[in-house]
Amino acid sequence: TFCDGALSRKNKELIATAIGIVTNCESCMQWHIEQAVKEGATLQEVLEAVEVAIEMGIGPATVNARFALEVMEECF
């Protein structure tokens, strides 16, 4: 599932990060942000994934995104 295909593994990890935010899964956010960074994701790319999650998840995702931002501080 997370192998390179039509979408790169990096992009799949960014998608999974956004889903983790929307579903409020902290362990998912932690894992997928770390994996996205290992696959070469930049700070800007991760931030844009967070922004998409906030846009799609409205209020609750905004609160959940704070955890993702804390993880990003550790990774960058």
Q: Which ranges hold each PLM region?
A:
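Iron-sulfur (Fe-S) cluster-binding segments and ferredoxin-like electron-carrier domains
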Residues: 30-44, 69-72
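Acidic, glycine/proline-rich low-complexity segments that act as flexible tails and inter-domain linkers
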Residues: 1-13, 63-76
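Short, thiol/selenol-centered motifs that function as redox-active sites or metal-ligating centers
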Residues: 15, 19-31
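Charged/polar positions within long, soluble alpha-helices
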Residues: 27-30, 34, 58-61
